[in-house]
Amino acid sequence: MVTTVGMESTLSGLVEDLILLEHDAIAAYEQTIERLQNPQYKQQVAAFKADHDRHVQELAQLASAVGAEVHREGDMKQMLTTGKVALASMMGDSAILTAMRTNEEDTVTAYERASRHSEATPEARTIFERAHADELRHREWMSQAASAT
């Protein structure tokens, strides 16, 4: 799935869309934890979900500062992110992790763009860069774990 998050014209719009994207990611992580068979994979994925939970908290604080709405759940894209995981679960852990890696592509791209957004304040840029580093780490682990399974 190709994301347009990070291309918003305003910082408040960007923060709102990042919050939606994070909620979509969290829903996919919950599906993944439920469907993975390998307990070590479940544990690692749960740790990554905690990163996404932290991203929502940090973005919610930033939203208050920039006058953005704090969404409490994802949007229609959530059906795509969770649907990929549900379908992949029929083929096992490797397929689930591959589906999650493709979901991580969107978050990596979104935070990379957000870090370069023209209206990003130094505080916002710090939040975006830290989240981007998390997403790169998640994507790399998903790729390696899917290949090893």
What residue spans do the PLM features occupy?
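Conserved alpha-helical segments that form or flank metal/cofactor-binding pockets of metalloenzymes
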Residues: Q40-M76, H138-T149
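Alpha-helical bundle segments that constitute or directly flank the non-heme di-iron/ferroxidase center
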Residues: V2-L36, S94-E119
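Membrane-interacting alpha-helical segments
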Residues: M1-S12, V66, A86-D93, A145-T149
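Preference for long, well-ordered alpha-helical segments
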Residues: N103-T149
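Generic structural concept
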Residues: I19, H23, I33, K49, ...
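Carboxylate-rich helix-loop segments that flank metal/cofactor sites and access channels
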Residues: Q57-V108
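Alpha-helical scaffold segments that form or flank carboxylate-/histidine-based iron centers
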Residues: S9-L18, N38-Q57, D93-A99, P122-L136
